[in-house]
Amino acid sequence: MNIFVTGTNTDIGKTYVTKYLYKALRTRGYRVCIFKPFQTEEIGGGRYPDLEIYKNECDLDYDVTSLYTFKDPVSPHLAFKIERHQQLNHQTMIDKLESLKAQFDMILIEGAGGIAVPIYEYSDHFYMTTDLIKDTSDFIVSVLPSKLGAINDAIVHQKYIDHQELPPNVLIMNNYTDSAIEQDNLHTIEKLIHKSVYTLGHQATQESFSEAFIQRIIGGSNG
């Protein structure tokens, strides 16, 4: 099963959620890996922030987690333009995933930035994150902010997913502290989009996910 982890924006906590989801699924006996096909922003010595987290905290090497890496902290489509020696090879990406599927029960695919990020610009169209999801994934984990603005972000995000006819998704509000505004954000989002929203606190562990959230992912259901 391929699970795509995306969010309403960049720096929303996708890596944080992915890391603990990986650990939570592992403790339940699943063979799990993480794959981030497009990683920007080198931090020196051929190292990249998210890939370093997966290496140091999940014991997953770069040869498992990465495919395309770029020096500058920019959108993948611009990174490809800057580093012109790199070209998107769709078949290489699919082959990498097929190789991982032969070894693991579940693959957590972390996207770059939010749901509408362009990945590669061809002469007549863009290859978008939504195309990547359609090509690779069975289910989506949508990471939401808990702060002011979360309601608008969540509604736009969900409407876009529905409009693009993407696979089923589950929503999780990151860095949730149970403050009055966060409680209202959670309640209002659920009423407006007619879906359950799960939460993950700032000081999380693999035990922090509710069993209902894990079962939703394992079952791959919408709602």
UniProtKB/Swiss-Prot annotation:
Its main location: cytoplasm. It catalyses: (7R,8S)-7,8-diammoniononanoate + CO2 + ATP = (4R,5S)-dethiobiotin + ADP + phosphate + 3 H(+). The keyword Ligase applies. Belongs to the dethiobiotin synthetase family. Mg(2+) binds at T15, D50, E110. It comes from the Bacteria. GO terms for molecular function: ATP binding; dethiobiotin synthase activity; magnesium ion binding. Its EC number is 6.3.3.3. GO terms for cellular component: cytosol. It comes from Staphylococcus epidermidis (strain ATCC 35984 / DSM 28319 / BCRC 17069 / CCUG 31568 / BM 3577 / RP62A). One of its GO terms (biological process) is biotin biosynthetic process. ATP binds at D11, I12, G13, K14, T15, Y16, D50, E110, G111, A112, G113, N174, N175. Homodimer. Catalyzes a mechanistically unusual reaction, the ATP-dependent insertion of CO2 between the N7 and N8 nitrogen atoms of 7,8-diaminopelargonic acid (DAPA, also called 7,8-diammoniononanoate) to form a ureido ring. This is ATP-dependent dethiobiotin synthetase BioD. Its cofactor is Mg(2+). Pfam families: AAA_26. It is an enzyme of class 6 (ligase). Substrate binds at T40. Pathway: Cofactor biosynthesis; biotin biosynthesis; biotin from 7,8-diaminononanoate: step 1/2. It is found in: Cytoplasm. Keywords: ATP-binding, Biotin biosynthesis, Cytoplasm, Ligase, Magnesium, Metal-binding, Nucleotide-binding.
